[in-house]
Each structure stands twice: as C-alpha cells, then as structure tokens.
A protein has these predicted regions:
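Divalent metal-coordination and catalytic microenvironments
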Residues: 15, 64, 94, 120, ...
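Acidic/His- and Gly-rich active-site-bordering loop/insert found
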Residues: 1-90, 99-102, 106-114
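Non-cysteine beta-strand/loop elements that form the S-adenosyl-L-methionine
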Residues: 63-65, 74, 177-179, 333-339
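Residues that form or flank phosphate/diphosphate-binding pockets in enzymes
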Residues: 23, 59, 99, 130-131, ...
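Metal-dependent amide/peptide-bond hydrolase catalytic core
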Residues: 38, 202-371
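Histidine/acidic-residue-rich, glycine-tolerant segments that coordinate divalent metal ions
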Residues: 49, 71-73, 79-89, 95-96, ...
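Conserved beta-strand termini and adjacent loop/short-helix elements that scaffold enzyme active sites
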Residues: 44-48, 123, 281-283, 313
Length: 371
C-alpha cells in the first residue's frame, strides 16, 4: 500500500491488526521504514526508526515523535480490523500516532514549504518508559542535532481535534515501590509467638495513606497507591513475609523525593515497633514531563492558525517517557481530542478503545504546519 493521505486510515488499521509489544516492534518498524523510503527520506535504524527530511539551507532542526508499541490487552472490539495477535492490542492509540506522523512526512516531502530539517522519530516501548531513553542512549539528539522536540497523544472523551497543552508540567512522574516485610511465621492459633507479617503489612498500608494530605498537600497532584499485597500464608499458617507493591505519581521532583523519604521513614518506624526488618525499593520510571515556553508557544500559534479549539489544561495524572527528551532539549507535549462517542471515547488502555480515524488528517496537517 502506498503512503497517501487517502490511505492513512487503512495504514492505521493495518498497524492495529498487527500490534507489537515494546522492543518487539519488528513488523511495525519494517512498515514504517518502507513508507519513509518511499517518500525519499533518509532512514536510520536502531531501537526505533528515524526518518530525516531536509529543505533549504536553514540550520533549524526539530524532532517530531510518535510511539509504536502496543499493550498486553485482549481486544474486545468487533470491527473488522481487530488485533490478530492474541493478548496484544493498540489500546492507547499508538497506531494512530504513527499514521499521523507518516501523513505529515508525506505532506512535507511532497510540498517542502519549510526551511531546515525535520526528524521523524518513531519510538519503541513508551508504555514501560524505556524507549525514549534507549533512543537517547543511541545518540538520537546528538546525532541529528535536534534543537526542539514535539510529542503528541490522543485523549478520549474530548471533542475530536481539540488541542490541550500548557507550559510547565504537563504529565506526572511515575515511580514504583516495593516494601518487603520480614516477619516471623507461625501457627494461626498462636500468633503471639511470631511476628504477623499480614497485620504489619496492613499497618504499613494505612500509614502510607497519610503521606498525601498529612505530609504533602492533597492539592499537589501527588498520588500514592498500594496496588499489590502478597503473602505466602495458608488458612492456618501466618506468613513469615509480606510484600507490598505500589505506584507513586507526582508533578514536582521535590514531592517525589519527599515521598521516597517518607516511605522509608514509615517502614523504619514500623519495623522498629515490631522488632523486625522491612526493606524498601523505590525506582522512578517516568520523570515529570515539562513543556518549555518557546515550543509550547509554537504549538499554540499553529493551533490558532489551523483553527483548532485550544484548551489550557491542568497537568495530567498519567506519565510519558517523552519527558526524557524534553528534559534534554526544549520540547512540548500536547494532546488532541479523540472524540466523545462510541469506542473513541473509551478510556485509554481499555479493551474496547479505538483510535478515531477522523483525527488522522487533523493530526497530520497539524504536524506539517508545525514544521
């Protein structure tokens, strides 16, 4: 299939039929590379795919990024292009992000009304927060001399094509924690002879709920959630160990550092009270995504010229590894409404979500105008 504006929907649906998980995007990368070569772009292979388009003698270099990976979700949609890879699905719209960026590459390569260099970045493994860093480790920004970078994401429940962005924090960071409680197991009829790791675990869970509201302001956007409570007990056996796992979101690096400190303080205090050991593991996977003033102004100005409705949104609670790029060079991450009806309005990461094909020409034209 040739890459033409009228074919973008079918190209998007082809990506949808054959979704691939992070760092496994083999077919996806081959398809993208083929389309970019068809347009005459310089194509570079690595953990992702990069296409380079030059026009005129200007030194300006901008990067436009789309993510490629799918999610380990079993699709429940009934349309004729549902996933053929069982248990894997494009439930976050990355199929549409790729198609929009390919559409922009077509428009700019056939009508090069810009001066400078556009670097089309197709990134793997956004969902686990590993792809952007992997491309940076390969030298993406230095090798292509990228001066500004832009990222896009669809947002269900918002009218089709409505643009949302803001200067400053746009997406929260995400950190994961694991708390290992080393109690003393024993018989359920004689709990006083052991150190009940379940009761102690419950105490830790309760204490963690006081971090936001009692240590960090409830309006800060910080969230601490315990998502797993794991023990090896039986009906008449008190477990000797309990593991708690959870998720932390913050909009400020200082809050993230404070929460890590408070997690350790709570664990240490409860461990001391019960004369046991508690180990805490804390790792940040996604940094806070920060939009810089100049590129954000460029996005807003382009939106006005394109006739798009603009919403100055609040920071989002979800996370994006685009943060690795925008922490290194000036950048802007923005969202386009995916629609308010049917599967287009279903939440991201749900089994009945679908990207809105009506957004493809809007996003493609916007990318091209931004360049």
């Amino acid at each position: 299939m040739n890459l033409k504006p009228e074919n973008l929907a079918e190209i998007r649906r082809d990506f949808h039929r054959f979704p691939e998980l992070g760092f496994q995007e083999k077919r996806t990368k081959e398809k993208i590379a083929g389309y970019l070569k068809e347009l005459g772009l310089d194509v570079h292979y690595g953990v992702g795919i990069v296409g380079v388009l030059r026009a005129g003698k200007c030194n300006k270099v901008i990067g436009l990024r789309a993510d490629m990976d799918a999610l380990p979700i079993h699709e429940t949609n009934t349309h004729d292009y549902i996933s053929k890879n069982t248990g894997v699905m494009h439930a976050c719209g990355h199929d549409g992000h790729m198609a929009m960026l390919l559409g922009a590459a077509h428009k700019l390569s056939t009508n090069a009304n810009f001066c400078g260099t556009v670097v089309f970045i197709f990134q793997p493994n956004e969902e686990l927060g590993l792809g952007a860093k992997a491309m940076m480790d390969e030298g993406l920004l230095e090798n292509f001399l990228i001066q500004e970078i832009y990222g896009i994401h669809n947002l269900p429940g918002v009218p089709t094509g409505e643009l949302l962005t803001r200067s400053g924090i746009i997406c929260s960071s995400e950190s994961l924690f694991e708390i290992k409680i080393k109690g003393i197991g024993g018989h359920s009829s004689m709990p006083q002879l052991g150190r009940d790791a379940i009761t102690i675990g419950a105490e830790v869970v309760q204490a963690l709920q006081t971090i936001v509201s009692r240590r960090i302001a409830s309006g800060s956007g910080a969230v601490v959630s315990v998502t797993e409570f794991i023990s090896n007990g039986q009906r008449n056996v008190l477990p000797g160990e309990t593991i708690l796992k959870g998720d932390v979101r913050t909009r400020r690096p200082d809050d993230r550092k404070k929460i890590e400190l408070y997690l350790n303080q709570i664990a240490s205090g409860i461990a001391s009270a019960h004369n046991i050991e508690i180990d805490v593991f804390f790792e940040t996977e996604f940094l806070e995504t920060i939009n810089h003033i100049k590129p954000t102004s460029a996005v807003l100005e382009t939106a006005k010229k394109s006739g798009l409705k603009i919403t100055d949104c609040k920071p989002m609670s979800f996370s994006e590894d685009f943060a690795h790029f925008s922490n290194a060079v000036p950048g802007c991450f923005f969202l386009l409404g995916n629609g308010t009806d049917g599967t287009n309005s279903q939440p991201l990461h749900s089994s009945d979500y679908d990207f809105n094909d009506a957004l493809l020409p809007i996003g493609s034209d916007f990318w091209a105008s931004l360049a």
